[in-house]
A protein has these predicted regions:
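Phosphate-binding loop of NTP-binding sites
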Residues: 125-274, 278-290, 365, 583
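Short, conserved loop/helix-junction motifs that constitute active-site signature segments
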Residues: 90-91, 108-111, 228-231, 261-266, ...
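Acidic, Mg2+-coordinating active-site environments of NTP-dependent enzymes
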Residues: 104-106, 110, 234-408, 496-498, ...
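Short internal beta-strands
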Residues: 90, 94-100, 271-275, 443-444, ...
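Glycine/aspartate-rich loop-and-adjacent alpha/beta segment that forms the canonical ThDP
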Residues: 531-564
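Active-site beta-alpha connecting loops in nucleotide-dependent enzymes
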Residues: 76-79, 387, 396, 418-420, ...
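Short glycine-rich anion-binding loops that position phosphate/pyrophosphate groups of nucleotides
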Residues: 76-78, 219-220, 242-243, 276-277, ...
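Short, basic phosphate-binding NTP loop
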Residues: 2-148, 156-168, 305-306, 346, ...
Length: 585
């Protein structure tokens, strides 16, 4: 398994905006933008005199506006973007795209004569306008592959991009960890950027001669119209499990947001994993709800059986099935079999966990549909390589990333119930396959200002699967972190009490508020044969305490704690067998 490189360092909003933009954008006349909206079926009222020099950029953020930009003023949770229009205009914005409420705010600020495009749905219109300004839309940009689902988007995207490169395609990535356009990389702040930034990125990728780009598509991106004006050649679905209910309200609404990606107006072809995550319920429903033509994938004997799929839909048979799954080092070898023709693709994935087999299989099918069936033999050739080699051996920063041995130490982004179940199960399976016996320790918390109902559930999951549970802070955002920890601990302790009563097993539960101290505590408690899972933050390098960003990289902190353990063992003369090993990035 290859070692992941660290994500690029964080940038200021202005630096990131500059990194997104193409080097040159011809001016688009004001009437052309009004015409583009009309062609998209968006009613727009034009106010004020048209700017003489046209529009050369589009921005939703008044802090990063450049001369020649159209400023997009959207209604927000705390304030309307039009309240910041004066700042944008002072920076050189030549006009404003907003709604009726925004135009009224402009008038209140003495800006009634500013050129305005007034629409009802500002975010949808922003995508249409940005596509026209940056020359995107239609077939002018890179071929787009989308990936949506609760868990697995990042890993699937990284693996798909690696496959494309192996096939000689110049690829791009847009996702949670980073944004890459050819050789250029910038850190990411959103899983899916705003529509204005995405269309600038598509223009940048054209400049960088990117052939195909893989994009993570969050439910927020669909709901907030961040992907407006984009079209996907193929889009994939990983799974749907509890998360983001603070925004969506129910699993049904969450499902509907995800399903929006597979509207035929947005996507040419869909690849749906039927039995990912908690089982076939949502995958089967997504296959039926997708308006675009669908190819289906099932994990086969390692997951819900074809019979289980039939219970949800008697007429459903997966087009492709994962078969002949076997451990291969930390990862797995598997065969992807086409049900109708019997054609097989043999592959090896380096990441631990059966769920990463599902991610790898989905990546393979996305790439197959992107490059075309005529390239099936070439794809088979790059997949069928020895263990630890080839594109699917690629590691992903903070995704089941192994940072130490003796004890086994793994960092993962698992931050919801199913993600935690899968990460703990994967660690246990990999250790069992290697013949390692010992305890499992988990260190985790839960982010603030997010779905609160999942916190005690995650605590109970940790108590069921681990021997030592250390509850600590995650990024609390605006919440007091102590009640977050208490909520998790309530679920963990209730489950630990049940386990002690019914199974006679003791689960050790500790609370260590400081995350770095919690990591050191886990390393202190772990024996050489134990396994440590540090869950929740993955690749992230800062924690947000009510607006104060505190630097902390879980991978660095865990490596430092392990290195201190190695140094202490060497100094005490306890011998190399007890020193352990730190795996550097």
């Amino acid at each position: 398994m290859t070692t992941p490189s660290d994500p690029p360092a964080a940038l200021t909003p202005a630096e990131q905006d500059a990194a997104f933009r193409p080097s040159d954008t011809p001016a688009t006349p004001w009437p052309v933008l009004a015409q583009a909206l009309a062609e998209a079926g968006i009613a727009a009222h034009v106010h004020g005199a048209a700017p003489a020099d046209g529009v050369t950029g589009v921005s939703l953020d008044s802090r990063v506006v450049r001369p020649g930009d159209l400023y997009v003023a959207v209604p927000g949770a705390r304030a309307h973007g039009a309240a910041f229009a004066a700042t944008a205009l002072e920076a050189g914005a030549v006009g404003v795209l907003t709604d009726a409420a925004g135009r009224a705010l402009l008038a209140e600020q003495g800006l009634a004569d500013v050129p305005v495009l007034e629409v009802d749905a500002v975010r949808t219109a922003a995508g249409t306008v940005a596509a026209r300004v940056y020359g995107g839309g239609g077939d002018t940009g890179p071929r787009l592959l989308g990936v949506t689902g609760t868990n697995g988007k990042t890993t699937t995207s990284f693996l798909a991009a690696a496959l494309l490169e192996a096939l000689g395609r110049r690829s791009g990535i847009v996702g949670t960890i980073l944004i890459r356009a050819g050789e250029r990389e910038v850190p990411s702040t959103l899983t899916t950027p705003e529509a204005t930034q995405l269309h600038a990125l598509m223009a940048l990728m054209r400049e960088e001669e990117v052939d195909t780009a893989v994009m993570e598509v969050s439910s927020h991106a669909v709901a907030y119209q961040r992907i407006a004006g984009l079209r996907y050649a193929v889009a994939g679905f990983t799974n749907l499990t509890q998360d983001h209910l603070d925004m969506h309200g129910s699993m049904q609404e969450y499902f509907a947001a995800k399903a929006g990606l597979f509207d035929p107006a947005r996507t040419d072809h869909a690849v749906i994993t039927l039995d990912g995550g908690e089982g076939p319920r949502w995958g089967v429903a997504m296959a039926r709800a997708a308006g675009a033509p669908v190819t289906t994938l099932a994990l086969g004997p390692a997951a819900p059986t074809p019979g289980a799929l039939a219970e949800h839909d008697p007429g459903l048979r997966a087009d492709w099935e994962v078969a002949e799954l076997a451990p291969d080092g930390l990862g797995h070898r598997f065969t992807l079999r086409h049900a109708a023709t019997g054609r097989e693709l043999r592959a090896s994935v380096g990441l631990p966990g059966r769920f990463n087999v599902a991610n790898a299989a989905l990546a393979v099918l996305l790439v197959l549909h992107a490059v075309g069936e005529e390239h099936l033999d070439a794809l088979a050739a790059v997949l069928d390589v020895p263990a630890g080699e080839g594109p699917l051996a690629a590691a992903v920063p903070g995704r089941m990333e192994v940072v130490g041995r003796e004890p086994d130490a793994v960092v993962d982004f698992a931050h919801n119930p199913d993600g935690m179940v899968q990460a703990l199960r994967s660690l246990a399976d990999a250790r069992a396959a290697a013949g390692t016996r010992g305890r499992t320790l988990i260190v985790f918390g839960s982010a603030g200002d997010r779905d609160r109902d999942k916190r005690p559930v995650m605590g109970a999951i940790a108590a069921r699967a681990a021997d030592v549970v250390i509850v600590t802070d995650d990024t609390p955002h605006s919440e007091d972190p102590a009640p977050i920890r208490a909520h998790i601990l309530a679920g963990a302790r209730a489950e630990a009490d049940r386990i002690a009563r019914e199974e006679g097993r003791t689960v050790v539960i500790e609370e260590v508020a400081d995350r770095a101290a919690a990591i050191r505590r886990a390393v202190e408690l772990a024996g050489p044969q134990d396994g440590i899972l540090l869950a929740g933050r993955g690749h992230e390098t800062t924690m947000d305490y009510d607006g104060e960003l505190v630097p902390l990289d879980d991978r660095v902190a865990l490596r430092e704690a392990l290195a201190a353990r190695v140094a202490a063992a060497s100094a005490s003369g306890s011998g190399p067998a007890r020193e352990g090993k730190v795996i550097e990035s």
